[in-house]
Amino acid sequence: MRFNEVLKDVSTYEAGKPIELVVREYGIDSKDVIKLASNENPYGTSPKVIAKIQELAKNMCLYPDDSMYELKDALAKKYNLESSNIIIGSGSDQILEFCIHAKCKKDSKILMAKTTFAMYEIYGKHVGAEIIKTNSEQHNLEEFSELYKKHGADIIFLCIPNNPLGECLDKNDVYEFLKTIDKNTLVVVDGAYQEYAAFKDEKKRICPKDLIDTFPNAIYLGTFSKAYSLGGMRVGYGFAQNEIIQNLYKIRAPFNITTLSLAAAIEALKDEEFVNDCISKNFEEMKRYEEYVTKKGFEYIPSYTNFITIKFGDKYVSKEVAQKLLERGMIVRDLTSYKQNAIRVTIGKPEQNTKLFQLLDEVLQNL
């Protein structure tokens, strides 16, 4: 059978392994499996959100409000925007897909960091775009500028903070870079982990309204999957000027967000105390990781997210380490597919992190 020729160069995205898979493949009881692979919030979902979902469960026979009025209104009030500046997606990665289909076609150019969220490249290849990457692993804006001057770009992706490495650009450096970009180039600022970065360092905070007012060719993406603990509900959002939003809506299918997902997101926005408490605990536990990794003589990338990237250098092979941990019921993310001899570990609860340290010690002693 013939398929679109551009798919020959497309790799499928490798998601973090689910707990159910480990139970099936290794015969480990589900209560003994710890998942620290997908940057989910280990503290669960706000009790207020759970109560709202239970209340609305009886309405699942009805289609959702396709205008998404209440969620847009809540986001508009929180970020001082108009509802017309907002688009809602099934996760922020759906809005990434909208952006590429709205701006790119075969041989369009997309500029991104060498090591960043894999879906930028995958979605770009779906339309046959040319992918231009920096040579430096982390976001080097000087190199971005050089490549932009040389090749141009229809879209530039900036992941702030960056997944899967965890580093984060300063807001002022981002703004200086954006001043040099042509107004016909769409700049996607992926802020999936911005809540964490802004909590840790005010210099990393990007205000969505200021961003899109200052740079009308920019779109800011956020998600409810990380700090707001709604990974299973799949809700993301994009903020941009009306012209961008209107064109993205031409690609969106109706009813792309479920009734329960909309309600959960609205309720999650109300419980900032829960969110801030989770983020505070995250960075307290991250200190333990930094101390552990330093003591073991490994390298880590200072992280502004809810995960940490641990590099093994030439001492161990990350794929082997991740596999041995998996066999013991500990799921982490091997970064071999990103050409990194490293693992990415979600910062868990204290007891989960203690278990990770114990199992990692055991694995390393036997490799």
UniProtKB/Swiss-Prot annotation:
Pathway: Amino-acid biosynthesis; L-histidine biosynthesis; L-histidine from 5-phospho-alpha-D-ribose 1-diphosphate: step 7/9. It comes from the Bacteria. Keywords: Amino-acid biosynthesis, Aminotransferase, Histidine biosynthesis, Pyridoxal phosphate, Transferase. GO terms for biological process: L-histidine biosynthetic process. The modification N6-(pyridoxal phosphate)lysine is found at K226. PROSITE patterns: AA_TRANSFER_CLASS_2. Its cofactor is pyridoxal 5'-phosphate. InterPro entries: Aminotrans_II_pyridoxalP_BS (IPR001917), Aminotransferase_I/II_large (IPR004839), HisP_aminotrans (IPR005861), HistidinolP_aminotransfase (IPR050106), PyrdxlP-dep_Trfase (IPR015424), PyrdxlP-dep_Trfase_major (IPR015421), PyrdxlP-dep_Trfase_small (IPR015422). It catalyses: L-histidinol phosphate + 2-oxoglutarate = 3-(imidazol-4-yl)-2-oxopropyl phosphate + L-glutamate. Its EC number is 2.6.1.9. One of its GO terms (molecular function) is pyridoxal phosphate binding. Transmembrane segments: none annotated. Belongs to the class-II pyridoxal-phosphate-dependent aminotransferase family. Histidinol-phosphate aminotransferase subfamily. PANTHER family: HISTIDINOL-PHOSPHATE AMINOTRANSFERASE (PTHR43643:SF3), HISTIDINOL-PHOSPHATE AMINOTRANSFERASE 2 (PTHR43643). Homodimer. This is Histidinol-phosphate aminotransferase. It comes from Aliarcobacter butzleri (strain RM4018).
